[in-house]
Amino acid sequence: MTATDTHQAIDAVWRIESPKLIAGLARIVRDIGVAEDLAHDALVAALEQWPESGVPNNPGAWLMATGKHRAIDYFRRNKRVEQKHVELGHELEAEQERAVPDLDAALDDDIGDDLLRLVFTACHPVLSTEARVALTLRMVGGLTTDEIARAFLVSEPTVAQRIVRAKKTLAKEQVPFEVPRGIDRAPRLASVLEVIYLIFNEGYTATAGDDWMRPALCEDALRLGRILAELAPAEPEVHGLVALMEIQASRSRARLGPAGEPVLLLDQNRAQWDRLLIRRGLVALERAERLGGAQGVYALQAAIAACHARARTADETDWKRIAALYVSLAALTPSPVVELNRAVAFGMAYGPQSGLDVVDTLVGEPTLRNYHLLPSVRGDLLKKLGRLGEARQEFERAAALTRNARERTLLLARATACGT
């Protein structure tokens, strides 16, 4: 293996193993910032040694053992709890006396719990939403600051600052590296799910920039969701979120035209929908429902997505079922955005005037003042009612509000189609 091949192998190993490595070391040092530094020390050691010695049979175990040695050095340098590095030294000696497969098993025993702790810590509500997203993608997703910056159209120094500040905040607030229990678990899990879905949504419909979608972010969010489903298999809302993302991701290819332009749901070629992702999503939804989570926020949205997925054509869509699901969702989590989606469903199920009646109750809603989808939906309903002049004005207003260039082009085209 050439030096170049070795470095490529190290890059691949790091991408896969870094979340597990950071999680395992964080359990030891109880500080994810320090854990990341120790993990990078182990990476540097690999870069120095593997080109000469070759990539180990179990590179993840090698990195973990090296990271633990660095943790001992860290405790010694900081003169913290002498017993800690003595215990860690004994642990390493015991591991080195075992065969490699036994070491693998020993590491795997704890790694699931460690990863779950890392997920909950990175998504702790003491952090801002932007910080939680950046830290989760960095620590759990294994992305570089450059990759995160490019995905969210911000500068790399901005992302780096968010991550540094997040780690400092966690240390300052003495956030424990643990999985929350009891009454704290539900709100903390909600924070984790919110972060993952925010990442997915930014990939599914980019809020700004020239691209309608950023598929890599959808893939990252799906990967995080699937990991979480394995780590917390008894949580129905985790499976509900995975179901929602799987089904929505199944439409990705059909959502873009030949030139990258947006293709709306009812205009999509359903033959391009990914049937494997749909099946996976439906299985996840069934799992959520079996666990008693049919009325969860994400499970309800997944059930709505499933209605679209099961319809062979747009005309076969069960809009009355979708409208009923939105009524349930609005009762569970009242919000103007949910009401706007309910308006769309009512417009399709019971006629455009029914939808417009709902939308018109939202026109003065302060939180939707700059939300481009409000005039977009209103324009669509007005167009169906034959009120083309008003529809054109709404589409033009929506185009002025959106920050996505592709969406702006689509909205202006819809305005033009209404005539003068």
Residues covered by each model-derived region:
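A short, charge-rich alpha-helical start-of-domain segment used by transcription regulators
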Residues: T2-A23, G33-E36, A186-E194, L198
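Hydrophobic-face residues of short alpha-helical interaction/recognition segments
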Residues: L21, L25, L63, G67-F75
